């Protein structure tokens, strides 16, 4: 899907579900990692994560667009557009938009380190500089053991 097709889809959804036109820009942003999309308050544009579309398809993308359009239309009307606001939650329910999107991360990995002195194991999501950090129990040297994949998304 191109940005032009995304723009047309967003305008169509806005008219169908909100009975209001979407007059700004909707585009894909490859730098989005932990979110499905975002509404930009200053420019009123909507940015969407292309990985959500690639991984979960058009239905999930439509749900994310509806969610961001709730932010968009409520903000332009001067009503509560934040997640905790009552107006926003009512509009989510009315349009059938999801409150959260599915996760976009490919896999969840854990790095396993062990102490060379006391054999204590450490499970971390981020790398540890073994030259700088030591065991919290005995101050022994840490050694990298393995990288485990907890679960892989399909």
Swiss-Prot record:
InterPro entries: SprT-like_domain, SprT_Zn_ribbon, Uncharacterised_SprT-like. The active site is at 68. GO terms for cellular component: cytoplasm. GO terms for biological process: response to stress. It comes from the Bacteria. GO terms for molecular function: zinc ion binding. It is found in: Cytoplasm. Residues 6-144 form the SprT-like domain. Binds 1 zinc ion. Keywords: Cytoplasm, Metal-binding, Zinc. Its cofactor is Zn(2+). Its main location: cytoplasm. Zn(2+) binds at residues 67, 71. Belongs to the SprT family. HAMAP family: SprT_like. This is Protein SprT-like. The lineage of its organism: Bacteria, Bacillati, Bacillota, Bacilli, Bacillales.
């Amino acid at each position: 899907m191109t940005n032009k097709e995304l723009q047309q889809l967003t305008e169509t959804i806005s008219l169908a579900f909100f009975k209001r036109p979407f007059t700004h820009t909707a585009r894909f942003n490859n730098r989005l990692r932990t979110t499905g999309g975002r509404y930009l308050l200053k420019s009123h544009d909507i940015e969407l994560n292309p990985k959500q579309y690639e991984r979960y398809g058009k239905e999930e993308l439509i749900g994310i667009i509806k969610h961001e359009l709730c932010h968009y239309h409520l903000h332009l009307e001067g009503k509560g557009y934040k997640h905790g606001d009552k107006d926003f939650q009512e509009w989510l329910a009315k349009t059938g938009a999801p409150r959260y999107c599915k996760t976009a991360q490919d896999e969840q990995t854990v790095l396993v380190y062990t102490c060379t002195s006391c054999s204590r194991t450490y499970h971390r999501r981020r790398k540890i500089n073994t030259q700088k950090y030591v065991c919290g129990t005995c101050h022994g040297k840490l050694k990298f053991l393995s990288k485990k994949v907890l679960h892989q998304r399909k």
